[in-house]
Amino acid sequence: MPLKKTLSAVLFSGAISVLAGGAVNVHAQDAESQVVPSAEDVKEEAQANTKYLAAEALKKARAVLNAHGEFAPFGAGLFQDGQVNFVWAIKPGESTQGINPALVLNAVRTSLFTQAKTGRILASAVVYQYQGASSEGDAAMQVNVELEYLNGYAEVIATEYVQGADGIEYTTSGRREFDPSIFTEAVIE
């Protein structure tokens, strides 16, 4: 009797080993068949996703400017499913009188940093109004969008705007790279 139990146990454990070995083997084959994206593919994905996020952020800024004439700095996060969620320290339509824009920017950045650190977002946008100078040297209002992506890609887009007959109209824009503040090395690693 004990021999039968031992033999059954050996056969049973052998079957488990064969099944487990097969599963490990299939898993290894799946891992080998996965394509590792090239650096160029990653760069293209980052640019496509940040372009999409920038368009959504500028659309939201225009809507808020048309409705309220101004806005406090706000943020946007791009989730893995393509959804964009906005971060408001001061909700649209609330008074911006007496606010400290630096504190509001810090609150928005902190919220986005937390989302980035936990891996919830792929990209972030920090959006704020800025009074710059046009190419002719005149004062010009602009919407700045600081874009960042999880691979460390970071650029700011400055888009000038004017009040047109049908509301806010974006005119010219420029862009440049900057040091990331959301997807920092602490988040990327």
Predicted regions and their residues:
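C-terminal segment of classical bacterial N-terminal signal peptides
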Residues: I16-N25
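Low-complexity intrinsically disordered segments
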Residues: Q115-E189
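Broad gene-expression machinery/nucleic-acid interaction feature
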Residues: L11, P73, Q142
